[in-house]
């Protein structure tokens, strides 16, 4: 079982390069996966197949995408830029 110290930083928990999954939640718009992929491709070019799941009421979609992260700066930049997409509500 992994126990994480509350003072531990994400960069101290990861060894790069590593597999890293982003879960982006936003309004149920058909362009959501495209906008997420556009940001991902800018910082981690590759061939991705994001998984899209609707919420129970269908108002929101979650887009999960796994990348090979090369640095903590890349991870943080992607969190920031994914969160700035106009139809995104949350990035995990």
Swiss-Prot record:
Coiled coil: none annotated. Disulfide bonds: none annotated. GO terms for cellular component: cytosol. It comes from the Bacteria. InterPro entries: UPF0250_YbeD-like, YbeD-like_sf. Belongs to the UPF0250 family. This is UPF0250 protein VV0902. It comes from Vibrio vulnificus (strain YJ016).
């Amino acid at each position: 079982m992994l126990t994480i110290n509350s003072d531990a930083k994400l960069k101290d928990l990861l060894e790069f390069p590593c597999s890293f999954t982003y879960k982006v939640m936003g309004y149920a718009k058909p362009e959501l996966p495209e906008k997420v992929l556009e940001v991902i491709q800018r910082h981690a070019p590759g061939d991705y197949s994001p998984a899209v799941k609707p919420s129970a009421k269908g108002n929101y979609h979650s887009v999960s995408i796994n990348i090979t992260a090369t640095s903590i700066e890349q991870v943080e930049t992607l969190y920031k830029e994914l969160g700035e997409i106009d139809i995104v509500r949350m990035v995990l």
